[in-house]
């Protein structure tokens, strides 16, 4: 999918997200020219939040309640656009295409970015993640690449078993097309099926990111 619906209400923020936003504003006022070390900043915010009293947290909880009320009110009046993607139905039992190393990295780091930049758009979040990934050293990327390789290996085994099962079931149902052309066309059909699966899964991954 491309960009999400611009008319969709902005998501509600938690009390902690409001607290982090306040911390960022304070930091910008004190150090307008310095850049923020994301990992250190997140750690300091988390530690500070844990030591705060219930009374200190209450103002952020009030902000979160107000924002939730705003979100619920806007969602009642929100009408999602009609005629969204209507593809063919996918077999829910089909193995899901494995994520890439970059996708695993994004899944891990996206929540942190949302906390630090609560108002950031989907496109800007993706851009930020891309920049963070490119700054990672080969050593830092290695755990994600190893995990992705294992998931890919498992997927290849699962999809082979799934297709073998599908063929045996199709055989039981009887001839669905002229037998003379079956062997010749099978490899091409498999490639077409795989391409369709990949395209649909790519779209699903983009939806998940939204």
Curated annotation (Swiss-Prot):
Xref: Pfam families: HMG_box, HMG_box_2
GO annotation, biological process: cell chemotaxis; cellular response to lipopolysaccharide; defense response to Gram-negative bacterium; defense response to Gram-positive bacterium; DNA recombination; DNA topological change; extrinsic apoptotic signaling pathway via death domain receptors; inflammatory response to antigenic stimulus
Protein name from the UniProt record: High mobility group protein B2
Localization (cell): Nucleus; Chromosome; Cytoplasm; Secreted
Matches recorded under CDD domains: HMG-box_HMGB_rpt1 (cd21978), HMG-box_HMGB_rpt2 (cd21979)
Family statement drawn from the similarity comment of this UniProt entry: Belongs to the HMGB family.
Compositional bias per record (Basic and acidic residues), positions renumbered to this chain: 162-172
Tissues expressed in: Widely expressed in embryo. In adult mainly expressed in lymphoid organs and testes. Expressed in primary spermatocytes. Expressed in the superficial zone of articular cartilage.
Organism taxonomic ancestry: Eukaryota, Metazoa, Chordata, Craniata, Vertebrata
Annotated positions of the N6-acetyllysine modification: 3, 30, 43, 90, 114, 141
SS bond list: 23-45
């Amino acid at each position: 999918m491309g960009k999400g619906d611009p008319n969709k209400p902005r998501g509600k923020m938690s009390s902690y997200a409001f607290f982090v936003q306040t911390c960022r504003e304070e930091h910008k006022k004190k150090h307008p020219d310095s850049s923020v070390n994301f990992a250190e900043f997140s750690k300091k915010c988390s530690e500070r939040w844990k030591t705060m009293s219930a009374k200190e947290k209450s103002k952020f909880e009030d902000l979160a309640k107000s924002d939730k009320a705003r979100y619920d009110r806007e969602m009642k009046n929100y009408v999602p656009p009609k005629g969204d993607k209507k593809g063919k139905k996918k077999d829910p039992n089909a193995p899901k295409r494995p994520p890439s190393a970059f996708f695993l990295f994004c899944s891990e780091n996206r929540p942190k970015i949302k906390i630090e930049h609560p108002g950031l758009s989907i496109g800007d979040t993706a851009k930020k993640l891309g920049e963070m990934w490119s700054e990672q050293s080969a050593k830092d990327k290695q755990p994600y690449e190893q995990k992705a390789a294992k998931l890919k290996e498992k997927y290849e085994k699962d999809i082979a078993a799934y297709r073998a099962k599908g063929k045996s079931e199709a055989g039981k149902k009887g001839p669905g097309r002229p037998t003379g052309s079956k062997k010749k066309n099978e490899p091409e059909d498999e490639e077409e099926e795989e391409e369709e699966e990949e395209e649909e899964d790519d779209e699903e991954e983009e939806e998940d990111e939204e």
